[in-house]
Amino acid sequence: MVPQALLFVPLLVFPLCFGKFPIYTILDKLGPWSPIDIHHLSCPNNLVVEDEGCTNLSGFSYMELKVGYILAIKMNGFTCTGVVTEAETYTNFVGYVTTTFKRKHFRPTPDACRAAYNWKMAGDPRYEESLHNPYPDYRWLRTVKTTKESLVIISPSVADLDPYDRSLHSRVFPSGKCSGVAVSSTYCSTNHDYTIWMPENPRLGMSCDIFTNSRGKRASKGSETCGFVDERGLYKSLKGACKLKLCGVLGLRLMDGTWVAMQTSNETKWCPPDQLVNLHDFRSDEIEHLVVEELVRKREECLDALESIMTTKSVSFRRLSHLRKLVPGFGKAYTIFNKTLMEADAHYKSVRTWNEILPSKGCLRVGGRCHPHVNGVFFNGIILGPDGNVLIPEMQSSLLQQHMELLESSVIPLVHPLADPSTVFKDGDEAEDFVEVHLPDVHNQVSGVDLGLPNWGKYVLLSAGALTALMLIIFLMTCCRRVNRSEPTQHNLRGTGREVSVTPQSGKIISSWESHKSGGETRL
């Protein structure tokens, strides 16, 4: 069995290999065969693609996903709720004060929320003072309302950032998603009209810290860039790449699913909306390092096989298999026809499954048709077995299969799995149990005289007061009339008493009071 890296081809230039790593390279185009001497044999350089003459290598820097980049990009933020706290006091006739606190809501403005958050983060003492409820005022026989507008800051409130469309995902958002957060709109609406969500960092792009700068070698032909050798030493082709933005950064999605940002003059189409990229983690890096090491080892094996051919002056099908180009592109093909060593110019393409080149028994598909054999011999060590089956020295690599499974399982979902938004803020005021209040202004409202009675009691009291006043007026008028009648009678009696005199039998004149008194005494 050929080592695992032999079957791993990092260059994906064939459209059918979209997002997959090939397990083999087969001839796509084959030139005429010509006999050669064993001294014309050579080992291919599988670390550099000699495709379309792109042999000019130059150092350059590019940007890729960070190693260890996780699936969910967490973005810290806070929620801001507008709350109006109302303290209502009533002072009754005897001076007893009753205080009632009420709470209402209003929709805050982003600027006010940002200022309140900065107060809290800066440790401004005014923020601590603003956390208190409004101090209630009171007046005798009056209802006094003291109101304070508050900005309730709940921090932190973490949301998941989708790197593809820069949308945010959290249970606090309507339908669990917030789109369009940018410089012009720095907040998200939530499940409540009076609450908004804002990122802690107003510059959303800085929160998407998933990129790193790397150094590599660019393979170009004139002004056209064919591919590049990455920092791990593995060549990556730009054929089949498409443009894709991650967190607002424009880059290229390569055929193998990796994402890079690099300057190129090539005209590239945009990726389909459902196109994803592969994660860049330690496991994929480790496999890539193993592949590079294996490719280097395979070249050493090829050189050993070539040395053995030169030494023994003999060639076998097994030794010829070492001379096969392991990456897509232009190269050489070798075979042995009638004990004659043959060579041909060839172009290799990648193969995703063995069924692509082995559709049926005895058929080796090359260029869309079954390739003819010469006395059971094809090329690059491929022969026809005694049972009629095509025998390929290389078998599918377990390392490659592991890498393919890694790619299939490490893609970023466009929609993050989130809990049901209806489970958040069921009663509307649950968030207020964990609030931090920013209270800017206090407003007082003083009512008129209030006796503290309900509406029907007020009407009864007014009716009783009016009836009492009417009775008092009638009583006063009656008293006044009686006084006016008694005053003339008293005046006449007082005038007669001063002028009348009584002459007793003794001839002594006495006053009427004395005569009345004496007469009384006489009657006794």
UniProtKB/Swiss-Prot annotation:
Post-translational modification: Glycosylated and palmitoylated by host. Glycosylation is crucial for glycoprotein export at the cell surface.
InterPro entries linked: PH_Rhabdo_glycop, Rhabdo_glycop_CD, Rhabdo_glycop_FD
Chain ranges passing through the membrane: 460-480
Keyword vocabulary terms for this entry: Disulfide bond, Glycoprotein, Lipoprotein, Membrane, Palmitate, Signal, Transmembrane, Transmembrane helix, Viral envelope protein, Virion
Result after altering residue 55 to I: In strain: CVS-11, RV194-2[F3] and RV231-22
Subcellular localization, as worded in the UniProt entry: Virion membrane
Glycosylation sites: 56, 266, 338
Intravirion topological segments: 481-524
Topology in the lipid bilayer: Single-pass type I membrane protein
Record keyword Transmembrane present: yes
Any one cellular-component term (Gene Ontology): virion membrane
Family the UniProt entry places it in: Belongs to the lyssavirus glycoprotein family.
SUBUNIT field: Homotrimer. Interacts with matrix protein. Interacts with host TRFC. Interacts with host BST2; this interaction inhibits viral budding by tethering new virions to the cell surface. Interacts with ITGB1. Interacts with host GRM2.
Protein name as it appears in the record: Glycoprotein
Organism (species): Rabies virus (strain ERA) (RABV)
Gene name of this polypeptide: G
